Amino acid sequence: MKVTNWGNYPVIDAAVHSPASFDEMKKIVASSSELIARGMGRCYGDSSLNATIISTLRMDHILAFDDATGSITCEAGVRFSELLDAFVPRGWFLPVTPGTKFITVGGAIA
């Protein structure tokens, strides 16, 4: 599969794995010596590019929300846009937001 980053350069060929669960992800990680996790690929450099990629986009579930504290537990592939859509109407906002809402929680942490 051809992949690139925010700037659309470089474009590389990569083997992209897309697990839908933590168990699937563990199997992929155990079977590959060199891989990189990737969300939306919105980084400015090449840090989301590698010959072997594990995409977190299917791991996109919000698992828990504490309405008293605003604490969210979610999988790495949850997009900021989904968090904002779900929690701004409830009176909550993320304490830090980037210039785009098209990133994943995992990418923001990375």
Language-model segments: residues:
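N-terminal regions that are enriched for targeting/export leaders
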Residues: 1-4
